[in-house]
Amino acid sequence: MVSPKDLVAIVHSSLLGTSRPTPTQRIELTHAIRNSFPSLQNLLSFPPPKPSDRAQVQSKEIRLPDSLPISLDDQDIAISLKLSDELHLNEIDSVRLLVSSNQEWGLMGRDPLEIQRLATGLWYTGRRDLTSTLYTLLRAVVLDEGLEPDLIADIQGLLEELIEAGLRQRLITLIKELNREDPTGLGGPLCERYLIDSRGALVERRAVVQRERLILGHCLVLSILVDRPGSKDVKDIYYILKDNAAQLTEGNDTISSQITFSLLFSLIITFVSDAISRLSDKSSMISQDASFRTDFQDIVMASGSDPTADGFIGGIRLAWAVHLMLIHDGISGMDTISTASTTDMGHICSCLESIFSKNVFQFLLDNVLRTAAYQNDEEDIIYIYNAYLHKLASCFLSHPIARDKVKESKDMAMSVLNSYRTSDPLDGSMQTEESDRPLPFISLMEFKEPELLSGNDVLWTFVNFAGEDHTNFKTLVAFLEMLCTLASTQEGASKVYELLRGTSFRSIGWPTLFDCIRIYDEKFKQSLQTAGAMMPEFLEGDAKALVAYLNVLQKVVENGNPTERKNWFPDIEPFFKLLGYENIPPYLKGALRKTIAAFVNVFPEMRDSIWAFLEQYDLPVVVGSQVGKSDQSSQVYDMQFELNEVEARREQYPSTISFLNLINALIAGEKDVNDRGRRAYSDPCEKWQLVVACLQHFHMILSMYDIQEEDLDGFTEHPHFLVSLETSSLQTQLPIIELLKDFMSGKALYRNLMGILQVGVNSIISERLSKTYGKILEKAVQLSLEILLLVFEKDLLVSDVWRPLYQPLDIILSQDHNQIIALLEYVRYDSLPQIQRSSIKIMNILRCSRLVGLVPMLIKIDAANSLIEDYAACLEGRLEEGEVVENSCDDLGVLIMQLLVDNINRPAPSITHLLLKFDLDAPVEGTVLQPKFHYSCLKVILEMLEKLPNPDINFLLFEFGFQLLCELNLDPLTSGPTMDLLSSKKYQFFLQHLDTIGVATLPKRSGSQALRISSLHQRAWLLKLLAIALHTGSGSSSAHLEACQSILSHLFGREVTEAANEPFSSSTYPQDGLDYAGTSSISKSKALALLEILQFRSPDASMQLPQIVSSLKYDSLVEDILGNRDTSVSGSIYYYSERGDRLIDLSSFSNKLWQKLHSGFPLVDSFPNVAELSEVRETIQQLLKWGWKYNRNLEEQAAQLHMLAGWSQIVEVSACRRISSLDNRSEILYRILDASLSASASPDCSLKMAFVLTQVALTCIAKLRDDRFSFQGALSSDTVTCLDVMMVKHLSTGACHSVLFKLVMAILRHESSESLRRRQYALLLSYFQYCQHMIALDVPTSVVQFLLLNEQDGEDLDIQKIDKEQADLARANFFIIKKEAQGILDLVIKDASQGSEFGKTISLYVLEALVCIDHERYFLSQLQSRGFIRSCLGSISNISYQDGTHLLESQQRACTLEAELALLLRISHKYGKSGGQVLFSMGALEHIASCRAISFKGNMRRVDMKLQSDVGYNVQKQRTIITAVLRLVFALTSLVETSEFFEGRNKIVRDVVEFIKGHQSLFDQLLREDFTQADDLLMEQIILAVGILSKVWPFEENDGYGFVQGLFDMMSKLFIASPIKSILSQGSELKLSQLRFSLTSYLYFLVTKNSLRLQVSDDSLDSSTKLRQPTLLLLASLLSHVTDSLERAAEKKSLLLHKIRDINELSRQDVDAIIKICDSQEYVTPSDNIHKRRYIAMVEMCQIVGNRDQLITLLLQLAEHVLNIILIHLQDRSVSSNERGSYGSKSHIQQEVTDLCGKLSPTIDRLALLNEGKVGHNLKVFQRLATTVKEMAIQKCV
């Protein structure tokens, strides 16, 4: 069985939605009704208490169906039994109710009484859901609301089944039983009187039960319209009506009255509809039962002792009489039933006699139709009541018997009463009410539903009958009042006008009205002209008749045909003539002014003439005449005298009210506004009418008139001057100034207005429902609040000028906190949304800096809790509405949500903290939110976002709800509590909204663009909310971690795996990478589906004006208006929406257009001709349509970007922080990358969207690049294989091709910008970097070969195959680029030449990357042919025209220079000799040499960046540029090696030498640097400088620069072993070996080419030589050191390779030791398993092995150089001869040679013992050389 809560939700969504129910909803509805058939049939019938069940509860354990046993404690038992006793509920059901209450509210920590009240409230909520469901079903059948006929037929069939099964009898029984003072009804005397409803409010149980009875009464009424009742039901309803009517005398209870009305109208509808169905030959239930007619006649004619009950019985008699009349006509036509006909006639006559004698019509007017209870009932029910009253009256008036009775009553009245022109107050007691018995009843009844008058010939026939021969004013007035009602429609107004214009009636017509006015005007004029004459008396009869005439005329004018009514009353001056006479009755003046006001509203063109007539006849003298003025001789209207002396005596104020209303009507129509306060009341309605009229006047003054600067020119801050202004004539002050001064000083008007509001919202609600003036009082409250808002808008404009006598309104309010509370509590007033709206706006104003400490004040005076519940109830009530609010600024829900959002960041405690029930007694950030425990806006919002009720209506509330939660999660104070709350399982329904909202079909723009816009924003905030959860979710919280895993699973559609506490992917990757570029069985993830939602062409939001405007002469005027986009400027036509979009204010736009257009034509509406005016109107209409469309399109464009921003956030956060927990994450990243590129290349993608999409693609490619080298071992094994270490996750070739192709298309998109292309270039560079390596960068090739040889499954791995695949990928990349090369090069070269410095830099790097992938010298030729290389060199050279140090102040320009050098260097490296030749031929060395950016003076070492950030950055950047220049020069020196020369120098050598000479200081300083203290950059510069010198300086004959000695000095430092240990400790052994290699290369060149011969030792050096050359002993020392290094490197390499091979056999301790030795502890956490540890250790060891292998290679080459140099010297015979004296004596030389050979011999022996297996190189040639040297050394020693 469907629960009541689900049932009512299904019924409401299906039948009360804005759109028709879908087929699924219809099936669900029918199924739910069928399943709930027993509950509806036995409505509110529940199992009673049972002793056995009570015993089971007392046993402290019960078992509910489909649940585990429930244990109860003593408190649970006590509450359950009390619920059973007080609700007459079964004990088991009481326990079930308690369990449900705990699930709904959370009962932990609550006291027993509160728990009981909550459970009782839940109980009655379920009952209400059932009754509401029944009411909705009945209403859908009875009222035509556009539902499908077959659906209505199905529901009607089900309802008829229910009624036949006894539903109506159950309704009647319930209405009776629920009125009893016992547990089954209102509750016994010992029962708890209060309960807590679904909104958390404490309400009286009696009120809830009475409301339940009322709904049942309404259901009873509707059930009669579905299926007519039988005689038993009629009698039962009659007796209940009689009992209820008798109880009405006990008090004025609105709901009790409405229940009685439902019973009354149930019988009226029954009698009327049954009789009518008899006449139409339809089935009739009671009209065919003659015995029932006799019995019921006796029952209904029995008189009672209670007058109220007898009055309601009189109404039943009226309906019964009409019933008998109708069936009498049918019976009379049948000859066989003449006796029954005669009997019924007697019954009719007796009923009519009773009806007229007891004046039932007047009773129905006073006690039913005019009561507040009737007027405040449900609108649909009132409509049904009025419709059947109309049928009742029509049937009554159409019958001859009734008409005869009316005529008899009328004749009797006219024979008793005097003529309507006579009036004697003394005869009032003798004048009965016989005159107007049926007419006022008919008038009011017809006024209720005027549309029912259309085509009612019966009524018009009665009008002609009733309008004849009126001889007294009372019958005339009654008749005219009926005509006034009949004129409420256009058809009726025309008929009434014609009726009174013609000769239908002898003494009634329009001429009578005007003749009477003329006669009295002449009498009064004659009296004024006669000295000492008294003003004649205005007869009461004439006055009241005139009032009735004027009311008819007013209705005729207001509702007449617009075309015809212009000619009906051309002269309106007579209506003004009587206004100036003091003896005119005030009510007559009121009627005259109301009539005039009608003309103002209907005919605006008459406004000027009406003002003129008012000035002539009716303008009052409000204050005394000014000094110096003489008394006026003419009659003047003294409003104060009339108000205080005339109307106050009568306690009636029609004249004053009408005057104010007339003035208000005139003011409301003003367009040019630059030239411009205890009484007794006989009728309380009139009191509040007067108040409303005054308030409307003040409201219009404050809203229509603005304060200009010149209005404040006369004010000064001097207090005395302000006082003098107060004493000045009021006539010299603007009305708005007077009003503001009153409010800002808390004077009379302010006090009176606050007196209205401080009555309190509860009292206003009570009077609204129980008093006839309730609606007028409600209007007064509404106006009062709106006036306060208007004052708030203006007070700050004048407060600075008027201080200190006048203060802003908030200061005045804060003098009494009760005033503030009174204003804020009106949010509780749910009868009129405008009042709630004003209260919320006042709260929004006060919460700002207007009133500091608002929340503490509310807490202090104990008003906070009620306000929290009131706001929650207001928001919940808004959610339950079934209508769309057109203007979101007036939407109560939107206002509350904006209030909450805007106050999140306010200092704590803020209004948001209060209304969302954060803990304000402790730090807000420590709150534990419990929305189930507390009724607040948070509870309502979370339930709203969970269920998403009425999405077509509440879409804005959903949007702001998601936004609120996002903002709460971002705020430092509220993020913790909110995230903890949303991470709980109850609120993980947000994930489901990825389906219900996220990937749902986007609403069509043509259907509802507002819904479409909001739908995009909803998705954006939802994605942002989930992104925040992923970003901030704490790993220490299992709830947070589970929430994050669920989000990822829903978003990407993958299962999440976990190892220990760290999540890892469980997949392994094959050698060939992931093949998901082609077909795949994997379904599309929600992330991709969300992106597809976004891919639509953005609507045009440009400022291009419509064609009709641009082709006319108004285009410049419109552009001028639209040009000023500053919203802060007064009169701006732009405003910021609640979402922050800057939109056009269409109202301001229209006003500004008219103002500008009228400036050319000063007179309003005075255009040169009609055609010009028509053209202007058409233009403005077109502009307003364009403005509306512009606003919508701009909002949709912003919404699309907003959703894209939300999508990008959740994708990027997932990729960066959480995606490691997903399987196949590389596949996910690829798919997002591919989809992002596809979307950005689409022609529908805007520039802003492409920017965001490119950023997402950048993130994905970066994560793919990083993810290639992450640990990918299988979780199920502890072993590590070579596959784990060697292979990287790599996209397949097809996938890479797809990415590159789409990226190229995105770069070449039609709409682009440099900023977008910069990101696309960065993406292209990242892609090329990604494609470079398929084997892990940390694993050298030599190690890979070793792993392949030792891996058991090594045959499955083929390095050559992998290399081939990589080559194929690179070649394919080239051809894809080449296909679109022209377009790409056009863009890149343009950006590199003309773009910003940022654009130039990255464009140059793109060109470098293109050169990198060039396979056919294609890009080189393109760059040459386009002249870009030469341009690039020129750019470098042009720096010489500036100061180099000044250049470096432009840091980005330095980056551009670095990029230019990198491009040239890439050309040289990529194309080898040909590339170098191209550069050289273009004068690259000359251009580089002229670049002053490398003209550096100072220390080349690293600058302390902390001390001088700017200078330090510039120096560091210059060091980088110098390094780049040296790299390029070194690359060009490769041409020297391949050039043909003999001993002379060619051009290449000359140019390089000239470069060196030009930068002598640079090279000199580098040679003198202490390399033992150099950083990596400086060390590279030293190596490059030595390398350059070693290549070209041997050809320089003149060593005047000292470079040779510098190189020799460096050799002497590096070739000895003393500093080696300290250097090795710094990890720079490889760099030092490179430097030694360059030096030995230089020395080898000198020895071989220049025939340089070295001395054996320093002792043999000639002291006369200038150069301190290295010696052979120094080289022998170097060779010994190199041998040591070779042995250490080979041994370490061998050891590590063996450890790598045995890694799976090592224990965890051994593995950890390796990790520690490798200094890689940061990559390991204590929770990592042995598999990951082995992987990390293995990768680190592979890297070290690679470094050792590189060092070994370099050392072998270095040793080979040294051996060759020594060999050359040993082979030279001069070493052993005595021919050259410079070598010393023979014995000394021989000794040196012997020492040299002795030092070489052990070193060479060690070199000969090097193991090729350990070294990893072929040593045959090397060892042969070493053997040769050893042999030669031995020979020399012999």
Swiss-Prot record:
Residue intervals passing through the bilayer: none
Subcellular location: Nucleus envelope; Nucleus, Nuclear pore complex
Disulfide links within the chain: none
A GO BP entry: protein transport
Positions in coiled-coil regions: none
Gene Ontology cellular component annotations, sorted alphabetically: nuclear envelope; nuclear pore
Database matches in PANTHER family: NUCLEAR PORE COMPLEX PROTEIN NUP205
Superkingdom classification of source: Eukaryota
Name used for this protein in its record: Nuclear pore complex protein NUP205
Pfam families named in the record: Nup192
Alphabetical keyword list: mRNA transport, Nuclear pore complex, Nucleus, Protein transport, Translocation, Transport
Protein family membership: Belongs to the NUP186/NUP192/NUP205 family.
Oligomeric and partner information: Part of the nuclear pore complex (NPC). The NPC has an eight-fold symmetrical structure comprising a central transport channel and two rings, the cytoplasmic and nuclear rings, to which eight filaments are attached. The cytoplasmic filaments have loose ends, while the nuclear filaments are joined in a distal ring, forming a nuclear basket. NPCs are highly dynamic in configuration and composition, and can be devided in 3 subcomplexes, the NUP62 subcomplex, the NUP107-160 subcomplex and the NUP93 subcomplex, containing approximately 30 different nucleoporin proteins.
Organism: Arabidopsis thaliana (Mouse-ear cress)
